[in-house]
């Protein structure tokens, strides 16, 4: 009987792990934020007045993905697939942008959405 208990315990443990794994795989993965729908509205509210058609602070235009990838005086604003190494995220994270006198900071939720958007662009140059 004692030899049977470890076997029974192992079987129960394996079946529990299999169920947890199956549930995790069934969970829908959050979709990557969309530039037009999710990202651009934030930029329009908080960035484009200084980085758009009329003004291009640092020679950076934030109205299109292509312009962000091209960047401005300091190089590309984004490193696709790596938000942590993207200048845009660094400047927002340390609250260097937007400037205090120019308007509201990007919220923590917006910053996280921007990180997810950049990280989802892996493989894009």
Q: Where are these predicted regions, by residue range?
A:
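Bacterial N-terminal signal peptides
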Residues: 6-16
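Aromatic- and Gly/Pro-enriched helix-to-coil junctions and flexible linker segments
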Residues: 19-125
């Amino acid at each position: 009987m004692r030899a049977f208990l470890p076997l029974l315990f192992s079987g129960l443990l394996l079946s529990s792990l299999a169920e947890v794994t199956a549930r995790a795989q069934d969970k829908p993965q959050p979709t990557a934020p969309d530039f037009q729908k999710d990202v651009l509205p934030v930029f329009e509210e908080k960035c484009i007045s200084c980085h758009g058609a009329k003004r291009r602070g640092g020679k950076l235009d934030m109205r299109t993905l292509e312009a962000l990838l091209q960047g401005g005086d300091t190089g590309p604003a984004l490193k696709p697939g790596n938000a942590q190494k993207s200048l845009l995220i660094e400047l927002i994270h340390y609250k260097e942008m937007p400037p205090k006198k120019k308007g509201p900071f990007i919220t923590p939720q917006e910053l996280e959405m921007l990180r997810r958007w950049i990280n989802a662009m892996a493989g894009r140059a």
